Amino acid sequence: MTQIGQYIKLNDAVPNLILHITTKLLRNENLTSFKQEELLLIQHVCTSMLSHGIKILLLRESLYNSGIGDIVILNRKISNNYWFRIFSILKQHSDAELLRHMFNESHSAYISKKLHYSGNVSHMINFLFMDEFGVNLKIPEELICEGNIVFSVGAIYNHRLLKICRFFNRFWGDQEREPTVRLICKHLWFAYLIMFGKFEISTLAYSQQRAEHKAGLFSFLQNDFKVFCGMSENPQLLDSSAIFDLTGISAEDLFSYE
């Protein structure tokens, strides 16, 4: 392990390319200055981290739904837009017989079984994530078979992570939105380095940077890396109003932890 920050150590097995990309991202270099292989790796890492995050959210919802009554699940606040999207997908990919029973409450058990046993639930959810969020999400069979999976997806439909996912995949390669995409890349890349053992973080960092701090742990550790390496940073030019219009999230809150 090599010390690269007061609270950070680098795994010596990490290729130079990983450290090179990390340095360029933390310097806020424009993505157009990156080589093709660097961009491909960054895109792959970011989409993988987003996919992992979505699966964790779905697991959380599935655990929450276990051991509680149907009334609690049915009363959860889920966007009307989500149900409209689900119905639109069903109309495109289901048979007429199923649609005839769709709004008959006495047939709900029959519809649920048919959707799960026919594989329609898996197809519907995969189609939704690819079409709307641009991510090829391979949800584990254990989650897909969970009876309330459609409600679990609905519960996270407007989650901040999915808004970031939609923005990232929609505007990857768009020069006008490049500063915001670069910010997303920087945080997802740093999360990857920590979660996959490329960086080892001292436990002291968690006592120094607590959850109630606005900047968040990633920004704290990124600053530690930059100070230790004597690194200067290019100014980050973000269009805050455009970010809010497209994601419903302010630029300051995009990766905050409050």
Curated annotation (Swiss-Prot):
What protein name does the entry list? Protein U52
Name the gene behind this protein: U52
> Which InterPro entries does its entry note?
Herpes_UL79
Query: What family does this belong to?
Result: Belongs to the herpesviridae UL79 family.
Q: Which organism is it from?
A: Human herpesvirus 6A (strain Uganda-1102)
Source domain of life is Viruses
